[in-house]
Structures are given as structure tokens and as C-alpha cells.
């Protein structure tokens, strides 16, 4: 199944597909994503840090973000996380990860995560996952991520 995916750095041409995938997965629509990002945000973000996409038959079916701590320093949950867990040097924020419902359970999140780590070798990453986001918690456990504490 992993061979069914093209894993690549996102390009501006991927943004409409990323938005299409993001929108039904935001919290106010019953999904696990806490924040809805705009097309302009994705365009600016991909110039600063890698965004990895998974495509099947040319269609974006997953993505994972990386963001500098400075770019998210104004976000309350990030501020709380950094007060509780001071960031190590050269740390970046990882996530969110979004995978199309039809693709979940096939290892796509893990291969995108590994592709991102390859792009940022040796750099530590931090993320936060809402306690009620069971699918994300389970996926991250499978990927070997460790949980620290609840904020």
C-alpha cells in the first residue's frame, strides 16, 4: 500500500488539495484539526519550512506541517506548551498531520513523518495533540512518539 503514494514536498500547486483535505477535518466540522489555515498561510509557510504531502493518483490525500517556533510564538497553546516543556535548541513544531479518511490506517502518516524528519535531520520536534483526538494519539504511538504531559 505504501507504494500507492507519492511522497513529496508540497508545492503551490498542492495548496487547493491541502485546503480541500483540511476543511472537513477541522474541529468545528467534527474533525481533529484545531486550526483552519488559509491558502496564503500555506503559501508563506512552505517558503520557510517543509510541508510534506502524500498523493495518490495525483490527488493530495495527506499532509504534515513543520513550523518554526517563532512563527507560532503568538499562539496560546504553543505558549503553554513551551512554558511546560522548554524547547531544545533548533526545535521546530511538527504537525498537524491530516490524512484523508479513505487513507487512514495504511501507514501514510508514518511515511510522511519520516519524509519530514529526513528533510530536517537531527532537529528535535515538538507537537501537541488534543486529548480527545484518539486517532492521532494512536497513530503517533505507532510511530514511536512519546507523550510527555497534558497541558
Each model region followed by its residue ranges:
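A short beta-loop-alpha structural element at the N-terminal edge
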Residues: 4-20, 31
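Glycine-rich acetyl-CoA-binding "A-motif" of GNAT/NAT acetyltransferases
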Residues: 59-62, 135
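Conserved acetyl-CoA-binding loop-helix of GNAT-fold acetyltransferases
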Residues: 95-101, 105-118, 142
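Conserved acyl-donor/pantetheine-binding loop and adjacent beta-alpha core of acyl/acetyltransferases
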Residues: 65-96
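Conserved GNAT acetyl-CoA-binding A-motif
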Residues: 119-132
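Hydrophobic adenine-recognition pocket in adenosine-nucleotide-binding enzymes
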Residues: 10, 94-99, 129
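Conserved active-site alpha-helix within GNAT-family acetyltransferase domains
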Residues: 110, 131-150
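Active-site rim helix/loop that mediates acceptor-substrate recognition in acyltransferases
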Residues: 30-57, 65
Amino acid at each position: 500500500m505504501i507504494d500507492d503514494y507519492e511522497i513529496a514536498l508540497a508545492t503551490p500547486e498542492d495548496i487547493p488539495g491541502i485546503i480541500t483535505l483540511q476543511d472537513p477535518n477541522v474541529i468545528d466540522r467534527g474533525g481533529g484539526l484545531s486550526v483552519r489555515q488559509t491558502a496564503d498561510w500555506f503559501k508563506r509557510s512552505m517558503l520557510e519550512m517543509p510541508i510534506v504531502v502524500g498523493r495518490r493518483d495525483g490527488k493530495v490525500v495527506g499532509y504534515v506541517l513543520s513550523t518554526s517556533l517563532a512563527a507560532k510564538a503568538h499562539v496560546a497553546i504553543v505558549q503553554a506548551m513551551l512554558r511546560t516543556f522548554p524547547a531544545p535548541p533548533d526545535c521546530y513544531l511538527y504537525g498537524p498531520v491530516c490524512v484523508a479518511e479513505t487513507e487512514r490506517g495504511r501507514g501514510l502518516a508514518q511515511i510522511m513523518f519520516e519524509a519530514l524528519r529526513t528533510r530536517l535531520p537531527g532537529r528535535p520536534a515538538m507537537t501537541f495533540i488534543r486529548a480527545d483526538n484518539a486517532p492521532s494519539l494512536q497513530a503517533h504511538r505507532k510511530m514511536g512518539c512519546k507523550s510527555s504531559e497534558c497541558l
